[in-house]
Amino acid sequence: MHMPTPSQSRLLALPVQLLLILAGAAAMARAEELAEQPPITRPGCPDKCGNMSIPFPFGLMPGCFREGFQVTCDHSVDPPRAFLADTDTNRITVTDSDASAASDAAAYPGYTNTSYFPVELVDMSADRSQARAYGPITSGCSTNSTQYRFQTQAMTLGNGITEGPFAVSQTLNVVGGVGWRVDVAVDGSTTLACRTGTKRELAARNGSCAGQGCCEAALPPGPEYGSVAPGLVVADENARWRSSPCSYAMVVEKSRYVFSTPNLYGDRLLLESFPVVLDFAIVGNASCPAKGQRPPPDYACASSNNYCVNATVGLSGYALSYVCKCSEHYEGNPYIANGCRDIDECKFPDLYYSLVEKEASVQPH
C-alpha cells in the first residue's frame, strides 16, 4: 500500500486549512456586520417574529413595548405572523349579508354573521413612525342576476373612548374599486369616492385604474382615520353574474394594488390581501416639551441625536400626541437609547453622492 510522503501530506492538508481560514474570515466579517447594525429594541427583548423585525415601541414581551404597541407572534404557521395584540381596540370586523337589491353593503340591516379578527402586521418602521397592516376589502358577489352576497370589512384602530396610537394614513393610502359597474365610498359616506364604468370589456386595461373595470381616488379629506370601512354600491341586475360575479372596494397603500383584467372574472380577489399604511404616535395627552423644558418621565424620544414633532392621530384626529425622529445625518430608532446612529455617507455613495462630493470639495489639499 502506497503511503503519502510528508510533503504530499502537507499538500493534502492545504485545502482543509484554506477552508478553515476562509470560514474564519467569513465568521469575522459576519460578526463585524452584526456589530455595526444598530439595535432596534430594548436590551434583552426579542426583535423578531419569524423574519419580521419588531422595533421598539413595538414589542412581544412585558417591558419590551410601550402601552398600545404590544405584538403577538403566531408560531403555529410557517412563517410566523405578527398581529396587534389589543383586539378590543384594534381589529378587523367582517360582516356577511345577503341582499336582493343593490345598495351600500355597510347599510344592510339583515346581517347573517359578524366576526372579529386581529389586525395583521406586514412590517413596522420606528424611524418613520409607521407600520403596514393588511387592510379591509369589501366584496359583493352575485349568486344569480339579482341576488348578492356581501362581505363588509372594517378596520378599527381605537375603541371610540380613548385614542389609540394608530391611524390609517390619509396621504399614503387610496380607496379603490374593481368591477364592471360599482360605486365606491368610505365609512358609509354618501359622497362617492370613485366609480367604475360599463363600457365594453376591451376598454379595461392591465395596470389602469382610470374607471374602466377599476377606479382609484384619494381618501376624502378630514382628520386622520382611526377607523375605515370601504363600501360599495353595485348594479340592481348583474347580467354577467356567471363570468363576473364579484365587485370589490378597498383601502390600500398607494401603488400596492396593480389592476389586472382577470380580477374582473371569478372571485379570485376574495383570496387576496393588500397592505395599508398606519401612522403611529405617542398618545395620552402628550406633546413635545417646549425648548428648555424638562421632558416628562415617560418621554418616548430616548436616543441622543433626535428631535420631537407634535402630531395628531386617532379616531378624532385631535388627540395630543407626538413622534420622535432621528436628526439629520442620523438614522435608526429614536425610541431607544443610542438608537440614532451617524450615517456613513461614503458607504452609500449612490444615496448620498451630492453630499459626499460637497464634503470632498472642501477638504484641504
PLM regions and their residue ranges:
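Typically disulfide-stabilized, N-glycosylated extracellular/lumenal ectodomains of secreted
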Residues: H2-H365
